[in-house]
A protein has these predicted regions:
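Active-site segments that bind and position negatively charged phosphate/pyrophosphate groups
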Residues: 61-166
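C-terminal charged capping/lid subdomain of soluble metabolic enzymes
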Residues: 40, 46-48, 144-212
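A glycine/threonine-rich phosphate-anchoring loop and its flanking beta-alpha core
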Residues: 1-66
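Anionic group-transfer/hydrolysis microenvironments
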Residues: 31, 106, 192
Length: 212
């Protein structure tokens, strides 16, 4: 893929063992998107919304103008934009030691959601969508939270899950972005700009409303 990451999942969490191997080429045939069931298109849109949130307000605004039923008409613009964003981020930080971590917005809680439900109830994109919304509710203005949730719902994605934060947060301790006793996580206080934060895991648990 664009970025060159390969990884495997372990019982303790997703993508915990991996390597970097840049591809010779990446081919994108947009016509294949028309063959997908709606649920898989929605799954991919969770990651697309993420790109708008972390780097491109105009992309986010474009997504707000569409929904799951008509977004195919905008894929000629959406897909190249997402690729450009990822390529730009990866060129600055190929080995995921700093800036590249912003690509994991929504994934700290998203991976916890997937793990909690044993990778059976929520697809990756839907878990990331819920993770973005849950994190944004804790870190942003109510107006931005509502705006993100409205966009997420337009693509038939969840903004929350039945599991409580006290059930999900302990699973964040297995996240690959954790460094020793500290957890690094991504927030977007404004659309188009992501920030990497770090705090001791126990403090993160209290801050999010979970149990340490």
């Amino acid at each position: 893929s664009v970025g060159g990451k390969t990884a495997i999942d372990l019982p303790g969490g997703k993508n915990l063992v991996g390597a970097f191997k840049q591809p010779v080429a990446v081919l994108c045939d947009l016509d294949t998107l028309d063959t997908l069931p709606k649920m898989f298109l929605a799954d991919g849109m969770g990651e697309v919304i993420k790109y708008g949130m972390i780097r491109d307000e105009k992309l986010f605004e474009l997504l707000e103008q569409h929904n799951l039923e008509n977004v195919s008409s905008a894929m000629d613009e959406i897909v190249p934009t997402c690729i450009d964003i990822k390529r730009d981020v990866v060129e600055q930080d190929e080995f995921d030691t700093g800036e590249r971590m912003i690509l994991n917005f929504g994934h700290t809680l998203g991976h916890a959601v997937e793990s909690y439900y044993h990778y059976e109830t929520y697809t990756h994109g839907s878990a990331v969508a819920a993770g973005m919304c849950m994190m944004t509710e804790k870190t942003c203005t109510p107006e931005l939270y509502v705006r993100l949730c409205d966009c997420v719902k337009a693509y038939d994605l969840p903004t929350e899950v039945p599991a409580s934060l006290s059930e999900l947060v302990p699973l964040c301790g297995n996240d690959k972005k954790r460094a020793s006793a500290a957890l690094r996580f991504i927030v977007c206080e404004t659309i188009g700009k992501a920030e990497i934060r770090s705090m001791p895991f126990d403090e993160f648990a209290v801050w999010m409303g979970g149990d340490a």
